[in-house]
Amino acid sequence: MELTTRHPLERPIMRMFVAHSSGGSEKTIQHLGLSPDIVKFLREKWGIKELYPPQQEALPHALDGKNLMLTIPTASGKSLVAHLTIAHRLKHDLINQKAIYVVPLKALASEKYDELKEIANVVGLKVALAIGDRSGEINSIEDSDILVCTSERLDSLFRNRSNLISNIGIIVTDEFHLLHDHSRGPTLEVLISRIRHKKPDAQIIALSATVGNCEDLAKWLGAELI
């Protein structure tokens, strides 16, 4: 049984399983209502032939605009749920609004920036990276549809560019379990609280491999827990 991996977001493909599956992975992805260009991109560029069960459960909620808290193991495709939701909703439901993807570390921000650029190009969206040490960041932020940044950088942007909140359609928080971290948690909590107060209709997607009291946190976010 051959296992093939071509992209960080791709799950290993069990070719014998795919060949004998009753519905086929492409049918599963197509039934989500994604554009044909995205479906083709997933198949041909990222080599994604099927979805994990948690992805199949989470994506309909996310694509419908519901708040979502996704707590599944590492390498189970949490980021893919966020990426597809951003690409789909910014083109169909949230015209002229922004998605913000918040991560704890600069290295992770660069990784997610590269991933999002790939899928954003398919649907004509612009992605900006804001980590505080790049020239021309402000111009790229204002011109972007999707902003990838650390929580500290977003806090700084909110303090100096208060109008940014009014344009947020989706906020994704990766490594959400860091809400319990003594150094990073307070900043993240304040950011989410500020967005929920100033832009209550913004969709929140919280991604975490492990998080304590997940039911309470999901209730606080008003989110579906998966």
Predicted regions and their residues:
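Conserved P-loop/Walker A NTP-binding site and adjacent catalytic elements of P-loop NTPases
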Residues: 33, 39-226
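N-terminal intrinsically disordered, low-complexity tails of helicases
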Residues: 1-53, 57
